[in-house]
Structures are given as C-alpha cells and as structure tokens.
Curated annotation (Swiss-Prot):
Residues 515-553 form a coiled coil. Signal peptide: none annotated. Belongs to the protein kinase superfamily. PAN3 family. GO terms for molecular function: ATP binding; poly(A) binding; zinc ion binding. It comes from Neurospora crassa (strain ATCC 24698 / 74-OR23-1A / CBS 708.71 / DSM 1257 / FGSC 987). Its main location: cytoplasm. GO terms for cellular component: P-body; PAN complex. A zinc finger (C3H1-type) spans 24-53. The N-terminal zinc finger binds to poly(A) RNA. Keywords: ATP-binding, Coiled coil, Cytoplasm, Metal-binding, mRNA processing, Nucleotide-binding, Zinc, Zinc-finger. Residues 75-96, 107-117 have a biased composition (Polar residues). Residues 251-514 are annotated as: Pseudokinase domain. Residues 1-24, 75-117 are annotated as: Disordered. This is PAN2-PAN3 deadenylation complex subunit pan3. The gene is par-2.
Length: 656
C-alpha cells in the first residue's frame, strides 16, 4: 500500500480555526468547539465565537434579520413594497403556527395580483412543524388567528384521542353489529371491537377479560377444600354472554337518520342484509331495536314498508288475540300501528327484543365470504334436530289451541339463541291478509303450518335451504343413512298430505315423539338446576356486598352522633383495624398483598359470625387486639344502628 503523504504528528495535531471571511466572524460559532468541544486558540487570537448559547441566540437574530432579503427566495421583493401593500412584517405567536390559507373557491376577496405577489415571498415563520396527517384535529385556528379551546377545556389536546380520531374518519355506510356471527365474538377478543364505520368514532365495549381465569390446562392442583378466585363468581362464559347482551341492548347508532316514532326512540337497525326482500310478506320488511319512552324497555320493531291500512279493526282484532299467547318459543306480540315518519305509509309490529339472537337461517347456513355462496356446514346432530322439533311443536300447540295459525314458518323468521328458538313473525300475515278475498280458513292454515314445519326440519337435516327443494321424496331419501328412521317418519307425516278424512293435530305429533319430549324436558331441568346453583353463589356475593356497604359507611367518618371523630373512638376503632386486616395487608417487603381469596374468606366469616379469633394490630404496632368475627359483626351492627337512628329515611326506603 502506498505510504501516506502526512506525518503522524500532523494527524494528531488539532486543526486551527478557519480564517475569518466576513464581518460576522464574531457571531459565528468556532468549528473547533463544534467538533472537539473546545478551541486551543481561544485565548491566542481566534476571532470566532466560543459561547454556544450566545451563538444560538445570535444565529436566530441573524436569521430573523435575513428573512426579508433571502438569497434562496424565488425572487427579490423590496421591503417597502411589502409595507405599501399593507402587509405586516411581524407575526404573532399564534399566527406563526397558523395553517396555510387555501381558498375554497374561485370567488375570493383577495385580488389576483396580490396573491401572485404574496406567493413569491418566502415566510419561514409560516412553516409549521411536521404533524401526522389527519390527526392534528385537537386544536383549530380561526381566520383571525384566534385558537379555539377543545372540549376538554385545555388549549392543547391529544391528537390521537378517540374524539379526534372520530373527526378524521372518512364517512362510511351504517355498520350493523348484528351482521357478525355472535359465536366469533367470544374468540380471542377479535370481534369485541366495532369497525371504524360504527358511529362517529371508535366504540370500545366493556372489558370482558377482567375476571378471565387462566386456561384449564394450567389450572393448579388444589385440594378438595381449596378454591380459586374464579370459583366464587359466575362462570366466565355465562358472565360474558350476559354482559354482551346488556351491551348490545344499550347499543346506539349516532347519525343513523332513523326517525323517532311517537313512543319509540333510539332506533337501531337489526337486519343483517341491506337488500329489500319481500318474499315472505309481499312487502319489504325491516327490523329495528327501539326504546320505549314510558317504561324504558327495549323492543323489536318489524316495519312493513309501503303498506297502506284500509281497515283499522284488522290491527285491533289481530293484536288482541295474539297478545294473549305467552309461550317460551314464541316472540310475544305487544301492539301494531301505522306511521309515516319513514317517508311512506308503513305498518309497525312491536315484539319483545332478544339481544344476541340470530335467525335460524343465518346460524345454520352462513354465507361463504370468498365465493358469496352458502357454506355447506357439517351434519347437525340428531338430538339438536329433535330439540327443534319439540320447541316448534310447543309453539304450534299454543297457537292452534288459541284458534290461530303461525303461517310465517321460515328459517329466516325463526330466531336462534344458544339452541333456543322462537317464532318471530307471528300475526303479520293475519293483518296483511285480513281483508283478502281469497283468505283461507283457520283449519286450512293450520294444516299448512305442519307442511312448513316439516320443510324447515328437512332443510336442516339435508343442509339445504328450503327454497332449493325440487323433489321432497329425494330429499327424504338422503337423510336415511345419517338419521334414524323415526325422524324420517315424522318428516313424512308433516310434509305429505294426510289421508282423506284425517286431520293433522299437534297432539298427534306429540304422542309420537314422547321419548324425545322427555329427553328435552330433562335437559331443560338440568340447565335450570345449573342456573339456580350459580344464582345461589351470587346470592352470597350479594351478602358480602352489603357488608362492604356497612363497613364503608362506618369507617373514616368524622364527627357524628355528637361525638368528635366518631369512627376513631370506642369499638369503632376495631372496625377500622379490621378493615386494615382485610384490605391493607402487606408482605415481608412492605408491598401490598393482593389476595382476593383472603378478602372473600374474611368477609364470609364475618357474615357467618364465626367464633374464630383474629389478631388486629394498629398501624404503629402500639395496640393489639384479639377478637372474634362474631364480636366484630356485633360491633358493626351497633355502629350502623347508631347512624341509622340520627339519619333521615331515604326517599326510596331501601335499607341494607
């Protein structure tokens, strides 16, 4: 390799400051200070500036003086011409951060010549710092330079807040959360958040995982007498399902454009498809969730679009008969009325609202998103089909005994929730066809109910929608290898016409499926026992909550009952020490001990007035008491009773 042309001593020698080139040398920061942190010739004649703070200020002043005459600007404009045009050369702090003005249209108040002159002036103060696009919406500046205060009350706000994100989201179509499969909501929390199109911003549902227990695969080995924290509360699946129901019941759709009816407000669309479908009723129909103004309850509204009522007695007579039917497998009908709030003549039916329900069609024939076809699901268990048979038969028994007919028996008009089905479109066809000249008799309509009943079960058994049936006999033959002959016999009896002189009845059907009725009743009673067991455990949790109310009322109370510092005197002091014993324990390192089992154990013993004795110690370790749970419970009741004597009764009259 070629030898270097410099000596090693020259490389180690510090390079001197460059020679001054202009009159601003004293304001220029020395290069040695920038590179090495100091200058060797600072006291030996170096004419450059060696004070970094002074250099930054001087450089700022220098730049401000050079704003008007900037060699990098596109063109040169004298300063006097600016002032003659009425343009100020100074900028306020608020105007410096103002966004560049962009005219909305051609017709602006500024002349074209003035715009051309202003565009050639380079204004460094008007250049804003970089902020993420579409997120700088927390603060807005008006045209006069005044800055508006956000809703939070502060001058500055978080640009990534939920309210800011909602303002920047592009408008999208109305989002319907019921279009998703409810089963997917429980998986890994993926379906627990609404998409961006829902409302004006991101909507976060409750945190269902607050009491989520660990996986059963890693459940610790416990003795028979030991319990985990989650054993004291309602099971996670049942609790999560109930919380989802409450959440969907209170769900709103802001700016939906739906009107408020006379006694109904907060309408929320429930249809999973936005297409008009008039197959069942002959008119397009829509489903909404609404809240009643009088009682605050939520109901389901079925709207028949474009129907003009000609006989008011049709609504009164039909709804009067259907309101009498109260059945576990029928959605109760409350009333019907007409309205023009939707811009047309619509007929509204009011039903009970069952959150998290979906139609039987959507549950068993979900669409395949990739091919937009009905996905061929797996075989439906036979015991589930028999469960559907028993439930629909129960509904038809109540309807036929009331001298009525279900009429609208279709997969899309039966709602499903955890293998519980309900007929959800009763009474509608009775009103629509009330004055029809070709109206059939009740006996004929009841016989049609059996045929529609059989076609529903056959569609589920063959994984084929009812509308795709071309040959009933061929469809019945396909279920023989997969299901029992008894199920096929029931379907043939339902679908095929009866022999001359015979009439199908629900009693005859129930007589042929008694074994399955007994199995279904056994399953329902076992589920009822399980719910009662969990309800009893929640009852104990309610007793603990009442104890917590009493302890919170007594502890840390000031002057009361004519006694100064009442909660710190007498036996009330023991209640405070007991509170510390239960909730304020620490470990050997002085850190807080968080043990839910300890909380529940102590409060349960206090509720039971156990004779077990515990050691209560003051915070300064100067006072020690040995007392039983029974004594503490008596002290708590006496202290709460003293407060009750001097207090006024509550407006609701509720007591603990």
């Amino acid at each position: 390799m070629a030898a270097t042309r410099y000596n090693s001593g020259d490389l180690r020698r510090q390079v001197g400051s460059p020679r001054a080139k202009n009159r601003d040398t004293k304001e220029t920061l020395c290069r040695n200070v920038v590179i090495y942190g100091h200058c060797r010739w600072e006291d030996s004649g170096c004419t450059f500036n060696h004070d970094q703070n002074k250099a930054s200020v001087s450089q700022t002043d220098l730049n401000s003086n050079r704003r008007v005459f900037n060699v990098e600007s596109p063109s040169f404009t004298p300063a006097n011409q600016q002032q003659s045009a009425g343009k100020k050369s100074t900028f306020s702090s608020q105007a410096a951060s103002a966004a560049p003005f962009t005219p909305r249209g051609v017709g602006t108040s500024t002349p074209t010549l003035q715009q051309a002159n202003d565009s050639t002036i380079f204004n460094p103060a008007a250049i804003r710092e970089f902020t993420p696009q579409n997120y700088d919406v927390g603060n807005t500046i008006s045209q006069n330079g005044a800055q508006h205060v956000t809703q939070d009350g502060g001058l500055y706000s978080d640009p990534f807040s939920i309210s800011s994100l909602g303002q920047t989201m592009p408008p999208q179509g109305q989002y319907n959360p019921y279009a998703n499969d409810p089963n997917n909501l429980a998986g890994a929390g993926a379906g627990l958040y609404q998409p961006a199109g829902f409302g004006n911003g991101l909507v976060h549902p409750p945190n269902y995982h607050l009491y989520q227990p660990p996986s059963e695969l890693y459940r610790p080995s416990l003795q028979p007498y030991q319990r985990t924290t989650y054993d004291f509360f309602i099971p996670k699946d049942r609790r999560e399902n109930l919380q989802k129901k409450l959440f969907h019941m209170q769900q709103l759709l802001p700016n939906s454009g739906l009107p408020n009816l006379d006694r109904w407000h907060s309408l929320f669309p429930l249809d999973t498809k936005a297409t008009r479908n008039s197959t069942c009723f002959g008119y397009p129909s829509w489903m909404y969730k609404a809240q009643n103004n009088k009682n605050g309850r939520h109901f389901a509204l079925r709207r028949i679009e474009g129907y003009r009522l000609t006989n008011e007695k049709a609504i009164l007579n039909v709804t009067k008969e259907w309101k009498k039917i109260i059945n576990a497998n029928i959605v109760t009908v409350h009333e019907a009325f007409t309205t023009e709030f939707f811009g047309d003549s619509s007929l509204i039916f009011v039903y009970d609202f069952h959150p998290l329900s979906e139609t039987l069609y959507d549950h068993h024939f979900p669409p395949n998103n990739s091919h937009n076809r009905l996905r061929n699901t797996n075989k439906i268990p036979e015991n589930l089909l028999w469960s559907y048979v028993c439930q629909i038969a129960n509904a038809l028994l109540a309807i036929h005994n009331a001298k009525l007919a279900a009429r609208c028996l279709e997969l899309s008009k039966i709602i499903w929730e955890n293998n519980r089905i309900r007929l959800a479109a009763c009474s509608i066809l009775d009103v629509l066809h009330h004055d029809s000249p070709n109206r059939k008799t009740i006996e004929e309509l009841q016989q049609e109910d059996f045929v529609k009943f059989g076609r529903i079960i056959l569609a589920l058994a063959t994984n084929t929608p009812t509308l795709n049936f071309n040959n009933i006999d061929a469809a019945l033959a396909t279920i023989v290898p997969r299901y029992s002959t008894q199920l096929r016999g029931v379907l043939e009896w339902l679908i095929k016409p009866s022999a001359p002189g015979e009439t199908k009845t629900v009693e005859t059907l129930l007589g042929g499926i008694t074994t399955h009725l007994a199995n279904f009743a056994n399953f329902v009673m076992q589920e009822s026992d399980e719910k009662e067991f969990h309800l009893m455990r929640e009852l104990e949790n309610g007793r603990i909550a009442r104890l917590m109310f009493k302890l919170s009322v007594v502890n840390e109370r000031g002057d009361s009952c004519g006694v100064h510092n009442w909660s710190e005197t007498g036996e009330r002091l023991l209640l405070k020490l007991f509170r510390d014993y239960v909730f304020h324990q620490v470990d050997a390192d002085g850190k807080a001990r968080l043990d839910t089992n300890h909380y529940l154990n102590c409060l349960s013993k206090l509720d039971a007035s156990s004779e077990e004795q515990i050691l209560l110690t003051s915070r300064d370790n100067a006072t020690v008491f040995v007392v039983s749970y029974r004594s503490i419970r008596q002290m708590l009741d006496r202290a709460y009773g003293e407060l009750g004597k001097e207090s006024k009764p509550s407006a609701t009259g509720a007591t603990i």
